[in-house]
Amino acid sequence: QSFYDNYQIAKDVFDNIDLDIDVKKLCFEGPLEELSLTRNTQPCMVAVAVVATKLLKENGIAPDYVAGLSLGEYSALNAAGVLDDQTAINLVRFRGQAMERAAAGIESKMIAIIGLDRELLNEAVKEARALGVVSIANYNCPGQLVIGGEAEAVTKASELALEKGARRAIPLNTSGPFHTELL
């Protein structure tokens, strides 16, 4: 909210979003339960990214190249001028709604696994598949992988990963098994 309070660019972005939800209110006031819904989180995150990009550009910092992972692809396309602000926000609102519909009725979980080799995590995942769908969903960087799928299988895979030497297993606040074969 401090960007909104202090920079006209932020006011322009948030005040001109035309969506079926009040993005500004959700970002600044919540409630967290509503903001955490994928259909709401995604347009809010892209709106903040649009503001950040515009502020950087206003201060002479423009990207030579852009890239994004998952939701970040839309922010990258906006930063590159491929998608205008409203189109990017509309697309991710639709994307979030579609993801929620696809995940409805699936008891799912995602957990970040820290400090374990990919091959060892693959072993844990394969063993846990006896309980349901689980897979490595994100390769964030060496030593930081995310598993996702059906809750029971993901929990088991994380327990096995810890037994195999993972330093930590961090449950993620997600509303679906993103980047898995379930979604």
Features from the language model and the residues they span:
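Alpha/beta catalytic cores of group-transfer enzymes, especially the acyltransferase/condensing modules
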Residues: L19-K24, G30, A80-L183
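Helix-rich "cap/lid" substructures immediately adjacent to catalytic or cofactor-binding pockets
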Residues: Q1-A67, I147
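Gly/Ser-rich oxyanion-binding loop with an adjacent helix/lid
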Residues: Q42-A112
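Compositionally biased, intrinsically disordered low-complexity regions enriched in proline and serine
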Residues: D5-Q8, S75, N140
